[in-house]
Amino acid sequence: MIPGSTSGISFSRILSRQASHQDATQHTDAQQAEIQQAAEDSSPGAEVQKFVQSTDEMSAALAQFRNRRDYEKKSSNLSNSFERVLEDEALPKAKQILKLISVHGGALEDFLRQARSLFPDPSDLVLVLRELLRRKDLEEIVRKKLESLLKHVEEQTDPKTLKAGINCALKARLFGKTLSLKPGLLRASYRQFIQSESHEVEIYSDWIASYGYQRRLVVLDFIEGSLLTDIDANDASCSRLEFGQLLRRLTQLKMLRSADLLFVSTLLSYSFTKAFNAEESSWLLLMLSLLQQPHEVDSLLADIIGLNALLLSHKEHASFLQIFYQVCKAIPSSLFYEEYWQEELLMALRSMTDIAYKHEMAEQRRTIEKLS
């Protein structure tokens, strides 16, 4: 044996075995520690401690969630409280009113003038003042000023105008976004509707003039939605009797809308009608004009058709008048200013159709004579 070689080999093996032994020992110790820890953790005292700890953690998480939810709710309520105020920058302007009121001194008329400069519409101003009065941290002198200001505004404003403006505000905001219009304009239209004594055709025509013929259908949807909301409101703008009359007017307006759609779509479905005039707005204007002045049908048709009529044959004229007669006959007589006006209109159209038919026959005879 080579001296030293055995001890070297033995040493390396010993190191290897020693390392293995230490690993095994450490592993065994670790296992024993885990077993001991598990035993301790499974003891009744440990279980109670773990339960208390987990409960504390859950309580802390719930408290954090509740605080965040309460904060979001307060922020949402602050925003929602001014949702029916249609004036731009309502919240900053409301704070400005509160700041002005908080300054001691000054006459009520001065406060009123400044408040109206910020909120020109009385419904907006009343909503803002009512909301400010809900605050619990107001000084007594500030609260009394706000109450006096609110009372003054309510007394000076027509109740129907005030309540209607408040009750239709959310609908005005919603439809304002849909139509890309200022909601205050829609609110004004609803107020005008519930107080107007004009004929339904005039009301419908005013909407077209104000909003454009493309929006006429949606504007009526807004009026209907606002009226139903107003009826269900705790502080409605009208009496039951008045609402009954308004619902009848609404029915007439919806009937007018249906007649309008049928009249225009039927006429524009024919190519020779489009040859006369292809504009939807022109035929809509014609129908509304006929409801108000059917005796002028000849001149009204001439305005719509114009010189294009000269380019068409007598046969096409007669065909057009026959179709036009049918669409006018389909209009409910109750939509005319006077119901008997529809029959007078139809009589005039029959006369015009007879003349056109005679011209058509004469034209055919001339054609036959030329061929023979």
Curated annotation (Swiss-Prot):
Keywords: Cell membrane, Membrane, Virulence. The keyword NAD does not apply. Residues 1-19 have a biased composition (Polar residues). Changing Q64E: In strain: RKS3333. Residues 1-47 are annotated as: Disordered. Pfam families: HrpJ. Disulfide bonds: none annotated. NCBIfam families: LcrE, PRK15338.1. This is Invasion protein InvE. It comes from Salmonella typhi.
